[in-house]
């Protein structure tokens, strides 16, 4: 991740500096790392450290829209989980489909995005990223992907933004242990903790994906 020793207050957004015209300077606060699948990207913040601790911008809508996607997030969610928990693989069907921006505040997870866009050359493939409270990475998952994560640490605090409100009538999911996906969740099978609902999801080949590229 990008780091720099500096005074945090001197590196916040332009609006914090009254002698600057808004928009006259566009500092870079995030590095975008592409993944093997078109769409999902990893975001690394620019971190400023000194004797007091650290500072970074965890989100800038302007920079996100310029560098990642023209997305407007409307809802923030937070969950706490213990080691071995696996949540997923979830999505919302159109017209309530969701893009997500996820991060870990404490602990570590393996975060997974599965391409379920019919007609995509990477349909059925996935990207897995380790997110931790120390690496401060964020993972952007566009619409058309199923999302899930496994908890690798004793405890995790997980946050994510959504660009569409939760709509239970539009819930969709695929099985976390679908053999065609072959996801290594890095959790022994006898230690995996799932909700009863997540244990009953269908395999990808058995559903008609509502997404098309």
Residue ranges and their predicted role:
Residues 17-23:
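Short Gly/Ser/Thr- and charged-rich N-terminal loops/segments
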Residues 26-137, 155, 162-213:
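Non-catalytic, conserved peripheral segments adjacent to functional cores
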Residues 9-10, 16, 28:
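Intrinsically disordered, low-complexity cationic segments
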């Amino acid at each position: 991740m990008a780091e720099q020793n500096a005074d945090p207050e001197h590196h916040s957004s332009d609006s914090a500096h009254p002698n600057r015209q808004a928009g006259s300077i566009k500092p870079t606060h995030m590095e975008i790392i592409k993944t093997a699948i078109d769409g999902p990207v990893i975001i690394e913040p620019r971190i400023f450290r000194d004797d007091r601790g650290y500072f970074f911008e965890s989100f800038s809508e302007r920079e996100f829209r310029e560098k990642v996607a023209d997305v407007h997030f409307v809802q923030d969610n937070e969950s706490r989980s213990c080691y071995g928990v696996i949540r997923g693989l979830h999505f919302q069907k159109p017209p309530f489909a969701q893009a997500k921006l996820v991060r870990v505040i404490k602990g570590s997870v393996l975060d997974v995005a599965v391409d379920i866009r019919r007609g995509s050359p990477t349909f059925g493939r996935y990207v897995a990223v380790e997110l931790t409270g120390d690496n401060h990475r964020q993972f952007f998952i566009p619409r058309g992907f199923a999302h899930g994560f496994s908890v690798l640490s004793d405890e995790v605090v997980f946050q994510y933004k959504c660009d569409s409100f939760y709509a239970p009538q539009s819930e969709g999911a695929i099985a976390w242990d679908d053999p065609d996906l072959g996801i290594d969740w890095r959790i022994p099978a006898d230690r995996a903790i799932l909700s009863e609902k997540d244990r009953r999801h269908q395999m990808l080949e058995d559903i008609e994906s509502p997404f098309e590229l």
